[in-house]
Amino acid sequence: MRPAHVFATIALALLPACSGVRAQDAKPGFRVPDDVAFRTADIMSEGTRMAAEIFAPKAPKSEKLPTIVMSHGWGGTAALLRPDGIAFARAGYLVVTFDYRGWGRSDSRLIPAGKAPEKKDGKLIAEVKEVREVVDPIDQTTDILNAIHWVVGEKLCDPERIGLWGSSYSGGHVVYVAARDPRVKAFVSQVGAMDSRWSIANPQMRAYTFGQATARAHGSLEYPKPGGKFGSLT
């Protein structure tokens, strides 16, 4: 039998985030201190563009810097991590923050709206639906891995000193990724979400979770729409 926390992952995979959390997103205009270098970048994750922000000291003390990949928590965006990115850059780190696919300024994940048309030369034109503001732990840990793939190609990155930082829901993600990627030498899990058995490990919730999965597999249940209430699966 699978551990109870596996069922928590299944259930949480398709939950939309609370709109109240999204409202806390930082405004686009913010001031970067004179001693910090800042730029934006695009990171590709499974073919989808993720919006990233890069922080580094303007006068680095070495050619290669210890690097921190930071990931936001449930319903957040990378903009919320700007104060931390600035603080770490001032301490001598190269910092990468990013919006998960379908969040913030990142592009949406796309799924076909119906059956795919015939291909021509390996290409097709199809109607698609965007998937946004859906908390999917499998996709999000993949996004963190792709952020690591990206940053090792940065000139300032020391590939032997890469660390992860995650808060809340992503605090659990960084533990998962660090256990599977030998390039990660350290991680910080701030109030990390590690175990949801208290909310899911009962027969009623398991039945509900698997019922949702069956309906989705049959195509009778769509992904939640953006802006739904916390915990809603409709």
Per-segment meaning from a language model:
Residues 1-5:
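Positively charged n-region of N-terminal signal peptides that target proteins for export
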Residues 25-63:
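N-terminal cap/lid segment of alpha/beta-hydrolase-fold proteins
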Residues 7-17:
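Bacterial N-terminal signal peptides
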Residues 80, 116-155:
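Alpha/beta-hydrolase active-site loop
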Residues 139-228:
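Primarily recognizes the serine-hydrolase "nucleophile elbow" in alpha/beta-hydrolase
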Residues 49, 65-66, 91-93, 159-160, ...:
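Loop/turn elements at helix/coil->beta-strand transitions in domains of secreted/extracellular proteins
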Residues 21-23:
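Boundary at the C-terminal end of the N-terminal hydrophobic targeting segment
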Residues 61-65, 70-107, 196-197:
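Short substrate-entry loop that stabilizes the transition state in hydrolases
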